[in-house]
Amino acid sequence: MSALRQKLDALIEQTDLQVNERQREQLLGYVELLNKWNKAYNLTSVRDPQDMLVKHILDSIVVAPHLDGERFIDVGTGPGLPGIPLAIMHPEKTFFLLDSLGKRIRFIKQVLHELKIENVTTVQSRVEEFQPEEKFDGVLSRAFASMTDMVEWCHHLPKTGQGVFLALKGLHPKDEIDQLPEWCSVTEIISLTVPELEGDRHLVILSRKDN
């Protein structure tokens, strides 16, 4: 067993997540591809695959138990975070991964092909210009600088009625919450525990007040 696999198993052991053998292999395969492509494409500032397991894989999959619904979009996905790890954790759900940069979308397509991930659709577009045929149960992001930007640029993406925004944040974002537009309200703030990651992590669930 590789050192990377041992590390992944040890990290998962510190959570309540159920991760089967195929999922573990896909998560490792993703880290290996990210590490390989990163040298040429500069996809992430995290250079060490062991650190990627903590800062990218675990930091994404701890959100998996909180995804209600079937159809999700990860906006500003970058190299596929948190979308690819979440798609691996939820093969029964559908994920759209959106980014405006072609090199990131090319990388994601290669990951989907090599790891045989079949529940992901890639979208190369600016988020405010993307008009989906069908709206989403959840709009995910860990890339946006502020939640106000996120909800204003993505306001057209959640389903009317039950669609939500899911913002992955560090510290409890009280200031950002205070600045949210009138039409948006906080449904829930979930404190996340990521093994071996320093600092706080929170998942903020937002919805339209007229839902």
From Swiss-Prot:
Coiled-coil intervals, chain numbering = none
Q: Which Pfam families match?
A: GidB (PF02527)
EC number per UniProt: 2.1.1.170
Q: Which UniProt keywords apply?
A: Cytoplasm, Methyltransferase, rRNA processing, S-adenosyl-L-methionine, Transferase
Where does the protein principally reside? cytoplasm
Annotated GO MF terms: rRNA (guanine-N7-)-methyltransferase activity
Listed under GO cellular component are: cytosol
Localized where? Cytoplasm
Q: Which domain of life is it from?
A: Bacteria
Q: Which Gene3D superfamilies match?
A: Vaccinia Virus protein VP39
Catalysed reaction(s)? guanosine(527) in 16S rRNA + S-adenosyl-L-methionine = N(7)-methylguanosine(527) in 16S rRNA + S-adenosyl-L-homocysteine
Which residues take part in binding S-adenosyl-L-methionine? 76, 81, 127-128, 142
Known role:
Specifically methylates the N7 position of guanine in position 527 of 16S rRNA.
Protein name as annotated = Ribosomal RNA small subunit methyltransferase G
Protein's organism: Vibrio vulnificus (strain YJ016)
